[in-house]
Amino acid sequence: MATIHVDGKEYEVNGADNLLQACLSLGLDIPYFCWHPALGSVGACRQCAVKQYQNAEDTRGRLVMSCMTPATDGTFISIDDEEAKQFRESVVEWLMTNHPHDCPVCEEGGNCHLQDMTVMTGHSFRRYRFTKRTHRNQDLGPFISHEMNRCIACYRCVRYYKDYADGTDLGVYGAHDNVYFGRPEDGTLESEFSGNLVEICPTGVFTDKTHSERYNRKWDMQFAPSICQQCSIGCNISPGERYGELRRIENRYNGTVNHYFLCDRGRFGYGYVNLKDRPRQPVQRRGDDFITLNAEQAMQGAADILRQSKKVIGIGSPRASIESNFALRELVGAENFYTGIARGEQERLQLALKVLREGGIYTPALREIESYDAVLVLGEDVTQTGARVALAVRQAVKGKAREMAAAQKVADWQIAAILNIGQRAKHPLFVTNVDDTRLDDIAAWTYRAPVEDQARLGFAIAHALDNTAPAVDGIDSDLQNKIDVIVQALAGAKKPLIISGTNAGSSEVIQAAANVAKALKGRGADVGITMIARSVNSMGLGMMGGGSLDDALGELETGSADAVVVLENDLHRHASATRVNAALAKAPLVMVVDHQRTAIMENAHLVLSAASFAESDGTVINNEGRAQRFFQVYDPAYYDNKTIMLESWRWLHSLHSTVENREVDWTQLDHVIDAVIAAMPQFAGIKDAAPDATFRIRGQKLAREPHRYSGRTAMRANISVHEPRQPQDKDTMFAFSMEGNNQPTAPRSEIPFAWAPGWNSPQAWNKFQDEVGGKLRHGDPGVRLIEATEGGLDYFTTVPASFQAQDGQWRIAPYYHLFGSDELSQRSPVFQSRMPQPYIKLNPADAAKLGVNAGTRVSFSYDGNTVTLPVEISEGLAAGQVGLPMGMPGIAPVLAGARLEDLREAQQ
């Protein structure tokens, strides 16, 4: 710690910080542009000037840039010195000489750091009367709009995109006061993390194009704290709503998880919530048509059929909340509850959970991944299946440069010096996959092989680290040399990290990862292990348990069960579509509860219209076992009273109560959570994931809307001039209103939107943190349910045989895509322009045998259908395999590992 003196007052601060960060952490306001907590200091904008004095007697002082000045013990500075204030005002005036002053038509207005800092410096009169330089804007793709004339040349965008996210297609061009930030030519930004430019940019140069089409000012949107639903990582988000539509998603700061950044799937993939074809009312089949029901009719009709059924089974979902899955389990009974996951995937999920629970290896939180000094990724294409982990791995690799700089006593915020000292030095990263990955550019070595051979590599590494681990026969000398290099790097690391997951389609890969971690722990290393699952609540569903989807279909096929309730699950993604349709056709009652129109609704007798994550509350558990709560953003029935969309758990519990002729006893979310904990002690911690519905601050609920929210009385004037009462939220501590507490200093961690007096942009998160860039002042939300035990598992001993290609037979290798493999985001219209066209990848040797070239269309039979796809050639894919884009429409993830026998050139 260090003692600094600011305008005559004494403060204790972290001596490792610079003065800007130290003062902001104290709650003092210093304007700045180029500095960002995640990017460090470069001193490019000169906006954060303060007066520094030699000692208490010095009255003259000198101007220094606070972001470039260490907060050393005994520092004397003044923020309010007149010369410093005039200098800061002049800097804004210089920046404004070329700015178009177009706030009324700028989409950043009301959410703009430049506006905030201009007001903070007191600059209110423009003296510049000459020609401004102008730029041509670029088309940067479907996600981001570009308006270069608003640029103040703070350099944040290229520092984030190139130095932090390792993007290669955004740069700065030009010189002196005429510089241009963009691509060499028009085109879609290639980085999976490009959307963060929207929040990194302090002006309106980069804005959210998906928001542009249905634009609202920040102060006119309703927000709620939420969790990204698009993968298993559980990033924290702030969705914004207006007129019953999601308008945008912003990053919600969580110092333990995603801190300042999201991936583009999480930021832009929300369009499925706004689809017009969603089920909005319960419907029941009458012949070939559906008739619309009200809630009471739906409950009574379903209850009558369920009472007559001899056995009702429930099929849950890894994209539904803990509460909804539990409500289904209560309705049908624990013995009749099935997870809705394919048997193989469920076995891998249970294995991953066993490793996390019993392996004795620590599982780091997302942000902690950045602190590891050697990383081995086994079998997982992390950028496509858990993209935010890939961004954290990139920071871990860069830790080498920080380590080298620290050895020379260079502060962690001196980023230019760190980059200069590091000269692209990296901590070792080793990646195995069936083909190229997006992490290959920073990897020390990549291994492209079938999953069996990837697992064998992992087992061999574990054996080389600890000879009591099972040995692997038949390793050739070249590969053994590489293994020796990997072993040397992992053994020499203080904090090695092993990453694997369920998406490779191989239990052996997970076992190999566990063996490597155990071997490293045995050598005394502070080792971590990270498992990536498939869906937002895969881990939660795995902890709940239940039979597999294959078991459920077996119940229907044999006639053992004559009614099935399917919860938020497109079963065609988890099993053969032919088998699913045949099994459902045998059931006298098929009830579907979902917020999306899925293929299985064609087989449904009754459809209950569920609420999406934006219209409901619930708890999900991420890949590290962290339980996190998401909250309802808006009530769709407020805008259209014909809409009947309830939380899945509310539908299912009402149905359960109707069947048993009793009163509904879960009238709010807290009742469901209490019931979950009573029945399943492994979920005891979810009660602490967020405060309950009685939580108040000075007697007030928490506001979902900024206090400047406007137009509420006119919002439904086209329907009726009589304004209805605002929706009442009995489930949570939030109010559907601007009336309520939204103070930055209030004791709360669930924060719907970032705002503080004088801070309207995302930089307002500074005001909610214990120190800038650290944890939230009152603790990061969420609670871990899985902690490493003292003991550990024995080594897994079954080493798979090496993959052998077979003539006339090809095995399907899984390829995942950030844009397209996820069930929900692929429905977003804006995503469909970024999704690749379905393809089949072939090794050049296999292509030659078949007599086909890139672009040739080939056919194969699967599940009773003939599939025809264009060929892509890949040297990385091993012969005897074909690659298919998992999860894309018509290509279910359950296909991974299946074999094809009739691959042939398609008939023209």
From Swiss-Prot:
Keywords: 2Fe-2S, 4Fe-4S, Iron, Iron-sulfur, Metal-binding, NAD, Quinone, Translocase, Ubiquinone. Residues 83-122 form the 4Fe-4S His(Cys)3-ligated-type domain. It comes from the Bacteria. Its EC number is 7.1.1.-. GO terms for molecular function: 2 iron, 2 sulfur cluster binding; 4 iron, 4 sulfur cluster binding; metal ion binding; molybdopterin cofactor binding; NADH dehydrogenase (ubiquinone) activity; quinone binding. Coiled coil: none annotated. It is an enzyme of class 7 (translocase). Binds 1 [2Fe-2S] cluster per subunit. This is NADH-quinone oxidoreductase subunit G. It comes from Salmonella typhimurium (strain LT2 / SGSC1412 / ATCC 700720). The gene is nuoG.
